[in-house]
């Protein structure tokens, strides 16, 4: 009987990507198969996030539930990974001594040996070090699960915003070699992936080493990914205004595979608050980037992150944020009340705002953006939209569910053989959280670009033979 693995994931898309790699790694090394039932699992892994308030307590509550399982089944291995593990590794060992393995985002590739060590020595094992990009060298080949896939192209962040723990939990910015990124995407394309989402804490700061010693910029990488046959839609997240340079904006002019939707966090519309956050841009500079983007791609829609109730935020500061929201006309946002993260400078800033005021401001902000998002959705009524079919509709299994470039879910009638393909649909109805459409044309009637096959791309990337000799085919 195969061994069972359960992974519980909290947090960002990078954590989701890391969890998928943990599953691939443990399957390849030890034959573990995923389960959703904790009682079945031989290994229980918690991949944590420290961005939101009470992240640590949430971890210990979950571990308390798993301890009950371990009491009944002592052989179960419990592991804690992710950003809370990096931040609170010693505290986890003290407060939850029954945890067998503690690992950070950069050491997940060592999971098989850490689990084996904890079992053989009957003692907890912890590795929360930062061995740069080493983890990608030890991961098995990617396995596609559907028509979309995440691909991590860099790790860490070097910006040190005063409210953010990422530099302390994931380390400084480190980019994966260009060849490695392209090889992984080409492998996914061969397995039927049509859309890739390039991931990084500061993804547009990518500077990937090339085989000839040169450096590949993010703009160059986008064009190379777009050239792979089968990859017809590219997203990326999360980007930073400081490095959203003109060469990246130029890619929107000539690369149709790059979607007309961008998540570009601004956090606040107040220059005073941005300075306190150590965000190296002003509201005007942010709007300048958006103007250039809309010149290059007139139909592009923008989303952002916002922090409400940052220490010292006045009513004027908040109104500056509301003005920016209206000026830019954001389509959606991830918005939160400020939550002090231990170890960050902003955690020590004095704050005299009441919780009621913070909640009122968050509500006002979210209502404004929701209204703007609904207006965008209504403008789509009667238009044709190219969508990627993801699977059956969640509400009606006799229908299909697809996604537009601007992240709207569209439900429509169609046959199952369309799953994983692009179709053009006419939008016939608009709802709060989805759209309805009808098929206009299928992929066989489209003129999708084909530049280089996945096999050709893999042949062009740097590989090592059995003796460890690196080769490159130009």
UniProtKB/Swiss-Prot annotation:
Entry annotated with the keyword Transcription regulation: no
Domain TRAM: 378-441
Binding site for [4Fe-4S] cluster 1: 12, 49, 83
Highest taxon in the source lineage: Bacteria
Necessary cofactors: [4Fe-4S] cluster
InterPro entries referenced in this protein's UniProt entry, alphabetically: Elp3/MiaA/NifB-like_rSAM (IPR006638), Methylthiotransferase (IPR005839), Methylthiotransferase_CS (IPR020612), Methylthiotransferase_N (IPR013848), Methylthiotransferase_N_sf (IPR038135), MiaB_methiolase (IPR006463), rSAM (IPR007197), rSAM_horseshoe (IPR023404)
GO molecular function, one term: N6-isopentenyladenosine methylthiotransferase activity
EC main group: transferase
Binding site for [4Fe-4S] cluster 2: 157, 161, 164
CC cofactor note: Binds 2 [4Fe-4S] clusters. One cluster is coordinated with 3 cysteines and an exchangeable S-adenosyl-L-methionine.
Keywords for this protein: 4Fe-4S, Cytoplasm, Iron, Iron-sulfur, Metal-binding, S-adenosyl-L-methionine, Transferase, tRNA processing
Annotated function: Catalyzes the methylthiolation of N6-(dimethylallyl)adenosine (i(6)A), leading to the formation of 2-methylthio-N6-(dimethylallyl)adenosine (ms(2)i(6)A) at position 37 in tRNAs that read codons beginning with uridine.
Assembly, per entry: Monomer.
Protein name per the record: tRNA-2-methylthio-N(6)-dimethylallyladenosine synthase
């Amino acid at each position: 009987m195969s061994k069972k693995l359960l992974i519980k994931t909290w947090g960002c898309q990078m954590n989701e990507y890391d969890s998928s790699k943990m599953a691939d790694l443990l399957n390849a090394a030890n034959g573990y198969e995923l389960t959703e039932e904790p009682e079945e699992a031989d290994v229980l892994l918690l991949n944590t996030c420290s961005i939101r308030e009470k992240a640590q307590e949430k971890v210990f509550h979950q571990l308390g539930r798993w301890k009950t399982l371990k009491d009944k089944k002592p052989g179960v291995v419990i592991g804690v990974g992710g950003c809370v593990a990096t931040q609170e590794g010693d505290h986890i060992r003290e407060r939850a001594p029954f945890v067998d393995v503690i690992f950070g985002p950069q050491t997940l590739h060592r999971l098989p040996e850490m689990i084996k060590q904890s079992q053989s020595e009957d003692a907890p094992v912890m590795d929360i070090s930062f061995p740069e990009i080493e983890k990608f060298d030890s991961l098995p080949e990617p396995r596609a699960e559907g028509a979309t896939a995440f691909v991590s192209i860099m790790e860490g962040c070097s910006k040190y915003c005063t409210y953010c723990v990422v530099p302390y939990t994931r380390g400084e910015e480190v980019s994966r070699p260009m060849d490695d990124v392209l090889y992984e995407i080409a492998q996914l394309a061969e397995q039927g992936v049509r859309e890739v989402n390039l991931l990084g804490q500061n993804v547009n700061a990518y500077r990937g080493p090339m085989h000839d010693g040169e450096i590949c910029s993010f703009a160059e990488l986008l064009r190379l990914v777009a050239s792979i046959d089968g990859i017809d839609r590219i997203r990326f997240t999360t980007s930073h205004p400081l490095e959203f340079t003109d060469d990246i904006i130029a890619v929107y002019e000539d690369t149709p595979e790059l979607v007309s939707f961008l998540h570009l966090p601004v956090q606040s519309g107040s220059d005073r608050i941005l300075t306190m956050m150590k965000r190296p841009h002003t509201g005007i500079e942010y709007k300048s980037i958006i103007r250039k983007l809309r010149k290059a791609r007139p139909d592009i829609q923008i989303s952002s992150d916002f922090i409400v109730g940052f220490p010292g935020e006045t009513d004027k500061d908040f109104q500056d944020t509301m003005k920016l929201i209206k000026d830019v006309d954001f389509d959606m946002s991830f918005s939160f009340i400020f939550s002090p993260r231990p170890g960050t400078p902003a955690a020590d800033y004095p704050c005299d705002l009441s919780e009621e005021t913070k909640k009122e401001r968050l509500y006002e902000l979210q209502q404004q953006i929701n209204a703007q998002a609904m207006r965008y959705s209504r403008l789509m009524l009667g238009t044709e939209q190219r969508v990627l079919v993801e699977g059956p509709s969640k509400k009606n299994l006799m229908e299909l569910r697809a996604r537009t470039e601007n992240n709207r879910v569209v439900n429509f009638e169609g046959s199952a053989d369309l799953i994983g393909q692009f179709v053009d649909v006419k939008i016939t109805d608009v709802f709060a959280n989805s759209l309805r459409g009808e098929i206009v044309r299928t992929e066989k009637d489209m003129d999708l670009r084909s530049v280089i096959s996945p096999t050709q791309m893999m042949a062009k990337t740097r590989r090592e033979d059995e003796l460890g000799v690196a080769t490159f085919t130009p």
